[in-house]
Amino acid sequence: MRTILALILLGTTAALAAELPAIPNAPIAKKKELLFSDDFEAATPAKQWHKVVPTFAFEKGMLKGTQTRDQNIPAAEGKPAVTAHAAVHGLEIPTKDSVVEVRIRLDGATFASVEFDDRKYTGAHYGHICLAQVRTNGVTIIDQRDGNMRNDIYEMSKDPAKKAERAQLLKGRQITYPAKVESGVWHTLVVETVGDAMRVTLDGKPAAYLKSSGIGHATKSKIELGVGGKDGYFDDIKVWNAEPAAP
């Protein structure tokens, strides 16, 4: 019975993978000037780093993320409610088209992510623009600006009666490709963003691709690294300005 179930799951996964759009084999971005790099070996963190959501620590030449806001706590005794949220650390590096390369390691964490935000943009919750997320079983790209974080769609997530309508609005705004990402092992993540397209590679292999309008947001004012669960690590981050690669 277990063998039959395994074969069914394998067949289902293969069928889903076959329906996904092809990922470009070649880079979609051409690197230009290097905007930022950090190997986390300095005694003092670079000034561009800042706290967003606890908890991150510079530890043994790495950036360690641990989700400590891991449960919803209702308001009580004059204290505001606390909503569970991934740990997030921000990098003040303005970009439009870019290549972000960073080594990641999931040591129990459910995911690690690279996100682009524009806090001055008011059309999406907290100025979220787009996101690349790596889990042990898949790589996801999300157009947040025109997808799940767009103000009206974000509000719909709080109303079960709007579930079907929200699902329709989210079509084409995010995609997940299956992957096998080993925990406790370093992986090289590269996120290319050019125009309204994002391409992700993992350990040099194409891992995900999405073309969606929100990705083309012209003023991505910051990059944020995220970790869900406990613990995730980042190292050797580099950020380049970029332009479309030659066809």
Question: Where in this protein do the model-derived segments appear?
Answer:
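Extracellular glycan-recognition surfaces and repeat-rich motifs
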Residues: 45-75
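Secretory/extracellular carbohydrate-interaction modules
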Residues: 70-159
